[in-house]
Every structure is written in C-alpha cells, then in structure tokens.
C-alpha cells in the first residue's frame, strides 16, 4: 500500500514539474527580439533575390522600430556616393553591437543587403557592414548572405562559424 501511495504522489508531482519547465522555457524567449524573428512580418521584407550592395560614408547610429510592436532596433545612416542619405537597418538592439565595427562619422563603408519599402519609406536591410577606413577591413555581420537568415536566430555553434573572418571582396 505504501509503494502505491508514493507512485500516486510522484506521478502528479513529475507532471507539475514538467509543465513548470515548459512555462519557464517559453517565457525565456528574448523580449528584445519581438518582431525580429525568422518568420516575422519584418523578416519577410528581406528578399534575397533583391540582394545588392553600395558604398558610402557613415553618418550616425540611429534607434529604429521598423514596424509597430517590434522591439527596438539599431540602424545607421549612410551617405551614398550620390549624396543621398540611406537608412540601413541592422537588427534588434539586444543583438547588434556597434562597437565591434568602430564606426566614426565620415568613415568609408560598404553595405550589403536588400532594398525594401517599409511603411512607404525605402530602406536598406543589411546583411553586412564593412568599415573600409580602419586599415584592415572590420565588418559587422547580421544576416546570412545566402538566404537572409538573421544571425540572432542562429544557434551558438552556427553563429560562431558565421563570425569567422572572410577574405576581402
């Protein structure tokens, strides 16, 4: 009888623990990535068939919220070779670390990514930004160039592989 009683208590307790673990895992989603996820409306604006690049001069870092309800993001303003100011959207503030590129106003940059229209405004969603003014190239990578997968959605192992330096192009 005692053995049956222990099983009777253990099984419900185990179920409660499993439910609690699932709730904890679900709540561990980073709120700093809201709206920036792989299948999000924002990410659907990145059409790899429109892949392009341009050169210009870095002007400033800006805070962005591309679509209502998204977590805050980071962008930069680049003056292109025609003198036009381009908003380059990099990614969520919780992921993008601008200090890795060491950009200063006037630095020459090469930006790779896609042109798109968001809320009636033409913007450039970046996959890479290279600082061409610091001697050897320093770059900030935020998406896979092959398919536009955001780096903030990669596993730690995938991210480590992608962060390896590439030969200059």
Where are the model-predicted features located?
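OB-fold (S1/OB) nucleic-acid-binding surfaces
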Residues: 67-90
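Bacterial N-terminal signal peptides that target proteins for export
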Residues: 2-13
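Extended, charge-rich, solvent-exposed interface segments
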Residues: 135-169
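Structural detector for short beta-strands of small beta-barrel domains
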Residues: 50-70
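Short nucleic-acid-contacting surface segments enriched for D/E, G, S/T with interspersed K/R
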Residues: 94-111
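Short boundary/loop segments of OB/S1/cold-shock single-stranded nucleic-acid-binding domains
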Residues: 30-53
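OB-fold/S1-family single-stranded nucleic acid-binding modules
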Residues: 116-148
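Bacterial N-terminal signal peptides
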Residues: 11-21
């Amino acid at each position: 009888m005692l053995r049956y009683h222990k099983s009777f208590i253990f099984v419900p307790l185990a179920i409660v623990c499993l439910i609690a673990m699932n709730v904890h895992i679900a709540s561990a989603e980073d709120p700093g990535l809201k709206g920036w996820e792989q299948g999000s409306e924002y990410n659907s604006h990145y059409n790899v068939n429109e892949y392009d690049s341009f050169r210009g001069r870095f002007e400033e870092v800006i805070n962005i919220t591309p679509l209502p309800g998204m977590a805050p993001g980071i962008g930069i303003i680049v003056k292109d070779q025609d003198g036009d100011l381009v908003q380059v959207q990099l990614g969520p503030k919780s992921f993008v670390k601008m200090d890795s590129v060491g950009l200063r106003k006037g630095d020459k940059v090469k930006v790779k990514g896609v042109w798109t229209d968001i809320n009636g405004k033409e913007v450039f969603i970046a996959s890479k930004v290279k600082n061409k003014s610091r001697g050897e190239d320093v770059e900030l990578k935020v998406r896979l160039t092959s398919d536009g997968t955001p780096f903030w959605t990669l596993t730690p192992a995938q991210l480590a592989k992608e962060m390896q330096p590439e030969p200059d192009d």
